[in-house]
A protein has these predicted regions:
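C-terminal "cap" of GNAT-fold acetyltransferases
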Residues: 117-121, 140-164
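Active-site acidic-Proline motif in GNAT/NAT acetyltransferases
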Residues: 84-86, 90, 118-119
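Conserved GNAT acetyl-CoA-binding A-motif
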Residues: 104-115
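Conserved active-site tyrosine of GNAT-family acetyltransferases
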Residues: 127, 132, 154
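Acetyl-CoA-dependent GNAT
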Residues: 2, 6-86, 97-99, 103, ...
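Residues forming the Rossmann-fold NAD(P)(H) cofactor-binding site
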Residues: 94
Length: 164
């Protein structure tokens, strides 16, 4: 049985340690700028919101991001979603995505958005499967081993979620 719980600042090291279990994933996220210091800073920001996927009180996945409040209209920017290898392709990333809406709906959440590397096909499939629509491209945004990769912008309007 699993639980999805709100993450607290004390959870930052558990999340980073989970990523360190897979060196390829850790290398990828470091290319994106997620070192230990940046990761810790994210958890202590005033507008931080994250959810953890727990099995028997052991963290197996998470989503972290920022709550953006403009004139009491709430948006959420997903910065990182991660699932441990043993729990991938079992629907848990989708459960984390749907729980963002459930957790923030009481705060007048209107939109969830993110960016993803254009070569991250599994993530793109996850987002489109969960109703996120591509809204733009940042050309040559990421620099992976001296190769420029586009960033694709995706968003999900909450009114679309309510209709479906």
């Amino acid at each position: 049985m699993y639980n999805i719980n709100k993450l607290l600042p004390v959870n930052f090291s558990s999340c980073f340690d989970l990523m360190k279990l897979n060196q390829n994933d850790l290398k990828y996220f470091k290319f994106l700028g997620w070192n230990t210091e940046q990761f810790e800073k994210q958890f202590f920001k005033d507008n931080f919101y994250g959810l953890g996927l727990f099995f028997d009180n052991k963290l197996k996945g998470f989503v972290i991001g920022d709550i953006i409040n403009i004139d009491n209209i709430i948006e959420y920017e997903i910065l990182l979603i991660y699932i441990d290898n043993e729990k991938r392709n079992l629907g848990y990333a989708s459960k984390l995505l749907s729980n963002i809406y459930l957790g923030l709906n009481h705060r007048n959440l209107k939109k969830i958005y993110l960016e993803v590397a254009s070569n991250n096909y599994k993530a793109i499939k996850l987002y489109t499967k969960n109703g996120y629509k591509k809204t733009g491209t940042r050309k040559k945004y990421y620099n992976f081993t001296n190769k420029k990769i586009d960033a694709l912008l995706y968003e999900k309007n909450i009114n679309d979620t309510i209709k479906s």
